[in-house]
Design a protein with these regions (language model features):
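Compact, glycine-rich, soluble single-domain proteins
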Residues: 1-29, 40-70, 75
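Glycine/charge-rich, flexible interdomain linkers and switch-proximal surface loops
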Residues: 17-32, 81-94
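Positively charged, low-complexity, intrinsically disordered RNA-binding extensions
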Residues: 52-105
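Residue-level signal for inorganic ion chemistry
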Residues: 4, 35, 99
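Active-site-adjacent structural patch at catalytic or cofactor/ligand-binding sites
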Residues: 33-39
Length: 105
């Protein structure tokens, strides 16, 4: 989880003065929102319904999520906000780009 936290905080996806993706969250001092989303583990290769057999068991996943949150909070003083693990949530955001990356551990 330390490696994932390092990547989340250090991945250069924010524009510098030249408009190039060259600044990290740590560089910008922005906040981090961590929300558990098991649907990202869906296997959509066949059929018309996603399979979640590759997702970690809920208890294991929650421990991992909490560990990642703890590490990010230690390493990112500007702040880390979270959703509630396993809860249905309505999340509002502005995606400037749109730019979305899937970081793998």
């Amino acid at each position: 989880f330390a490696r994932m936290a390092e990547r989340l905080l250090g991945y250069r996806v924010f524009a510098d003065e030249a408009g190039k993706m060259n600044r990290s969250l740590a560089d910008t001092g922005g906040g981090l929102l961590l929300v558990s989303q098991f649907t990202l583990a869906a296997d959509t290769r066949s059929g018309m319904r996603p399979s979640f057999t590759t997702a970690a068991p809920p208890e294991e996943a929650e421990r991992g999520y909490n560990r990642l949150v703890d590490i990010c909070r230690q390493k990112h003083p500007p702040g880390v906000e979270t959703g509630r693990f396993g809860a249905h949530m309505v999340i509002s955001l502005i995606n400037d780009g749109p730019v979305t990356f899937l970081l793998r551990p």
